[in-house]
Regions:
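Intrinsic-disorder/low-complexity regions
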Residues: 3, 10, 15-17, 21, ...
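Ala/Thr-enriched low-complexity intrinsically disordered regions
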Residues: 178-180, 189, 221
Length: 221
């Protein structure tokens, strides 16, 4: 399938899922429910893995449950990285907690799952500066915020408000020699020491008498 060039940033990130309506994702077009696989592609692209958009799309479409009617469930996002033998830290908590974790670990990139307006949504972010506070580049966040640079605290304030649970994925990298041995290692020296296990799970904060969808649908308002 041909990709509308308007979906891309100049350096090859997918910045706007609205231009991917010709990519069916379960029952719906990617423009409606494909934020999950778009975020994974951006994280892969940021890591320099050289993977094609179509390869990520096909891999995610193959493991997508419920015909995409629930968007991309969080466990499906994790499954993608596990099947690719990429170590992944999986973290749950409030917006404040996750901002702190990203800051303290100096994570170079990651994926956030949160509520944009009333819709569950995934975005990828990439660290672009080491100044204090660090600045990050965010992709496919909302209309008018398809590709922008800001602090994580700004993003929390504007997009992670309330007491809803936020989910964070911090994918690592593989060494070529480790892959040959069938083993995987997180090799980003700046932050690997903060992620001692392949899966880090923090206590889940839940609101009483409330329901939060577990998927990612749409790109927000």
């Amino acid at each position: 399938m041909k990709i509308d060039p308007r979906a891309f940033s100049k350096d090859g990130f997918l910045k706007d899922q609205d231009y991917l309506s010709n990519f069916p994702y379960g029952r719906y077009p990617t423009s409606f429910n494909g934020c999950g696989w778009v975020a994974i592609y951006n994280a892969e692209h940021a890591a320099g893995h050289g993977i094609a958009v179509e390869a990520v799309y096909e891999a995610m479409r193959r493991i997508l449950p419920y015909e995409g009617t629930h968007g991309t469930p969080f466990p499906t996002m994790v499954r993608y990285f596990k099947e690719k033998h990429i170590p992944i830290a999986r973290i749950y908590g409030s917006g404040e907690e996750l901002v702190r974790i990203v800051r303290e670990s100096a994570a170079p990139r990651g994926i956030l799952r949160y509520i944009e307006g009333r819709e569950p949504h995934y975005i990828a972010f990439v660290r672009v500066s080491d100044e204090t506070p660090a600045r990050y580049r965010f992709f496919n966040a909302a209309d008018g915020k398809e590709d922008f640079v800001e602090t994580m605290e700004y993003f929390r304030r504007e997009h992670l408000g309330g007491r809803r649970v936020v989910r964070l994925l911090l994918p690592g990298e593989e060494r070529e020699d480790a892959r040959a041995r069938g083993k995987n290692h997180i090799v980003d020296a700046k932050w690997s020491e903060h992620l001692p296990r392949r899966c880090v799970q923090y206590p889940v904060l839940r609101r009483k008498n409330s329901f939060e969808p577990l998927s990612g649908i749409g790109r927000g308002a």
